[in-house]
Amino acid sequence: MDARTQALPFDPAALRGLSAQLLNSHHQNNYGGAVKRLNAIRAQLATTSFASTPGFQLNGLKREELIASNSMLLHELYFASLGGDGQTMEPAMALALAASFGGVDRRHEEFAAMGKALGGGSGWVLLTFQPREGTLVNQWAADHTHALAGGTPLLALDMYEHAYHLDHGAAAGAYVDAFMENVDWAPVYARYQRAVHAASEPFGATQDEVAGSMLLDVRRAGVFAQATSMLPGARWRDPAAVEHWAAELPADRALVVYCVYGHEVGRSTALRLRAAGLDARYLRGGIDGWQAAGRPLQPKPADPGATP
């Protein structure tokens, strides 16, 4: 089945610092060209006799298939990353960036600097979720064939000249700044949620499975500050600073972390703890599900981080 081009998910006339002419040309010619090239390569592969085709020809076809496939997919992610104000994001998305980079601004600074460093050359800068560690990383890619094994790209910046030359000439830095001002964090967050849920699903604990485990409340600091209760015996730890407290936890004891609903905050924290060699799981349904089931809670103590 042939791949089909996807329409721009935003009004190209509405972006700041990126003209409709540039965006339409990029979409129609470069992205559209990648889709057409991929379909042509697939058609040729469908009629190829693998037994009689010389190895160098087959290698060439498969190499070009990879290049065209990633060009199509990364362009789709690039366009799907635009249409916002560059700043507005869900608190849980900000937490994920802070937990991985030390702060949202720090993440942005590194990402933009990586893009500007590619100016005059070519390649991509990607914000990628790495499931092994439950973290986010800004990934460098010199062309369409570089990828973090097992990672899920969430945000893409195209640094090939076709992405900016019509508007900015050789001023790649101005283009990067314009891109950063137009990022739509809502779909980035949705992709992050899906990636975290897929990676963490095997590590969920039901309410009946928490007995005997060390309980860690990892609700966001702002949410926890407004809370009045916790699970009995739990202690609070900041999910934005896992690397600062993970080493304090016992390696010979099962851990269960919980957030409000059992979504990406608790799940990503469990993944990070597991990457540190700990037997960590997240509580399915979070404290909300626990309370809805009529399970007991305790008042939040004066020192919620202390060992019970």
Q: Which functions belong to the PLM regions below?
A:
Residues 1-200:
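Feature for soluble, non-membrane regions of globular proteins
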Residues 186-227, 299-308:
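Flexible, polar/low-complexity N-terminal or interdomain linker segments that lie immediately upstream
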Residues 226-230, 269-271:
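Short amphipathic alpha-helical segments
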Residues 230-232, 276:
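Short, structured coil segments at secondary-structure junctions
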Residues 232-233, 297-301:
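Short, hinge-like loop/turn segments at secondary-structure boundaries
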Residues 237-238:
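Short acidic-hydrophobic, aromatic-tinged amphipathic segments that line or gate anion-handling sites
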Residues 242-291, 308:
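Catalytic cysteine-centered active loop of the rhodanese-like fold, especially the PTP/DSP P-loop
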